Amino acid sequence: VIWSYGNKTIAPYSEQFYVGGANSIRAFTVRSIGPGRFHPAENSTYSYVDETGDIKLEANLEYRFRILSSLFGGNLNGAVFLDAGNVWLMRKDEARPDAEFSFNKFFDSIALGTGLGIRYDLSFLVLRLDWGIALHVPYETGISKYYNIPRFKDGMGIHFAIGYPF
């Protein structure tokens, strides 16, 4: 949680929290989820702004397993993961409805993603490739089920990174 003080009502952008990307909820691009259940309309003022918040809650579960040993001096490992979380605002923002934290909407405002990954471990360097699949987005999509991704291809994220995600 970040709380601005003094005469400021919002924390500096560089200090705000975000979710999504290679080290967060891997089914989504970086800073594309939240805050809360807010989702900018296409071509609106906020459609090109990275989404950040004052509160962050994130959980990651990952099972890693060996695929091949001693492959060109390293080990090839696999991973299956489940990521969940979101960011919220501390104060109500009229320009971004449903962006503030609310216990009543808590479970519906959690983004959920799963996926598979490959890790090449050289013991001094880990290269990884993750393929994330979105299961739930916190905003309204017109689908009333918990799996509310309109099209499968819209709910995928591929990330290449160095090092483990956590």
Predicted regions and their residues:
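Conserved active-site loop/cleft motifs that coordinate metal ions or position small ligands
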Residues: 79-81, 126-132
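Transmembrane beta-strand segments that form the barrel wall of outer-membrane beta-barrel proteins
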Residues: 45-47, 129-135
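A carboxyl-terminal module marker
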Residues: 113, 128-130, 153
